[in-house]
Swiss-Prot record:
GO terms for molecular function: L-malate dehydrogenase (NAD+) activity. Its EC number is 1.1.1.37. The lineage of its organism: Bacteria, Bacillati, Actinomycetota, Actinomycetes, Micrococcales. Substrate binds at R93, R99, N132, R163. Catalyzes the reversible oxidation of malate to oxaloacetate. It catalyses: (S)-malate + NAD(+) = oxaloacetate + NADH + H(+). GO terms for biological process: malate metabolic process; tricarboxylic acid cycle. Keywords: NAD, Oxidoreductase, Tricarboxylic acid cycle. NAD(+) binds at G12, A13, A14, G15, Q16, I17, G18, N106, Q113, T130, G131, N132. This is Malate dehydrogenase. It is an enzyme of class 1 (oxidoreductase). Belongs to the LDH/MDH superfamily. MDH type 2 family. The active site is at H188 (proton acceptor). CDD domains: MDH_chloroplast-like.
Length: 328
């Protein structure tokens, strides 16, 4: 195969999301069916035996695009030469853990990983954060990698975007492919704002097809609380859908999103739409060749402004908390 393999690092590789993710990467779902990949997989030492089992399965699939797999527990070894880093692993919130405890536990992880990426990753690396709290984990990693441009870091709100697209399509009797120009703003949390003001379904304004009451009373809260509903139903958090969204996010970032549409991605704000500069917040973006651009010139309604501001306020609170902990 003539194309040079891309080195992809994945953290938390033995977890449920990792298990759903790795086979699709090796199959070519993320970087295309012509591009070989080298997988570099990071786990904590106690999870390495399980990860070895996953590697055996990857080998047994005989994927033509899988050039090589290496595993380890040292981010400086795993990230060496990485061109795309998918930071999936994170400390989950456990019973009795306060929000500040969660930020502190993940802060240590993403501080170390940010520094390692800064020191050993490829000079043109792209970093995608899936592990929650994704926005603030991305901020911590980015601030601890001063030699990597901030625009190279992004965090996952594609799962929220996909949930919103699917729900709007179901409500209007349309295909998901018919839904365009939907936006998710703010934090990947219950304060996120899935915005239909500019969305279209088969060319028609979405708000001509659904009621404001449905949007406010059903659509927004259902999308925001979907993760909790899945956790309650299956006894475990979203894994396959989170992996799928990570694939979608990274594919669009590296290969470009669909023409004539945009997607949602948490990126380092440049001050657009009143979101404080430097904050990692979700915006509508277009993507091409590893770069993203925030969609400009959208009219923001009074209702939308209030929802965006509320989510941004939560992000500012998280940033203040990690600043207080000395993580950024």
């Amino acid at each position: 195969m003539s194309l040079t393999p891309v080195t992809v690092a994945v953290t938390g590789a033995a977890g449920q999301i990792g298990y759903s993710l790795l086979f699709r990467i090796a199959h070519g779902d993320m970087l295309g069916r012509q591009r070989p990949v080298r997988l570099r997989l990071l786990e904590i030492p106690s999870a390495l035996p399980a990860l070895e089992g996953t590697v055996m399965e990857l080998q047994d699939c005989a994927f033509p695009l899988l050039a090589d797999v290496e595993i380890g527990s040292d981010p400086r070894e795993v990230f060496d030469g990485a061109q795309l880093a998918l930071l999936v692993g994170a400390r989950p919130r456990t019973k009795g853990m306060e929000r500040g405890d969660l930020l502190e536990a993940n802060g240590a992880i993403f501080t170390e990983q940010g520094r390692a990426l800064n020191d050993v990753a490829d000079h043109d690396v792209r970093v995608v954060v899936t592990g929650n709290p994704a926005n603030t984990n991305a901020l911590i990693a980015q601030r601890n990698a001063p030699d990597i441009p901030a625009s190279r870091f992004s965090a996952l709100t594609r799962l929220d975007h996909n949930r919103a697209v699917a729900m709007l399509a179901a409500q209007t009797g349309a295909s998901v492919d018919d839904v365009k120009h939907l936006s998710v703003w703010g934090n990947h949390s219950a304060t996120q704002y899935p915005d239909l003001d500019h969305a279209r379904v088969a060319g028609r304004p979405a708000l001509d097809l659904v009621s404001r009451e449905w949007v406010q009373d059903t659509f927004i809260p259902t999308v925001a609380k979907r993760g909790a509903a899945i956790l309650e139903a299956r006894g475990a958090s979203s894994a396959a859908s989170a992996a799928n969204a990570t694939i979608d996010h990274a594919r669009d970032l590296m290969l470009g999103n669909h023409r004539g549409d945009w997607t949602s991605m948490s990126v380092v704000s440049d001050g657009s739409y009143g979101v404080p500069e430097g904050l990692v917040s979700s915006f509508p973006v277009t993507t091409s060749g590893g770069d993203w651009s925030i969609v400009q010139g959208l009219d923001i309604s009074e209702f939308s402004r209030a929802r965006i501001d509320a989510s941004v306020a939560e992000l500012e609170s998280e940033r203040a908390a990690v600043q207080e902990l000395g993580l950024i």
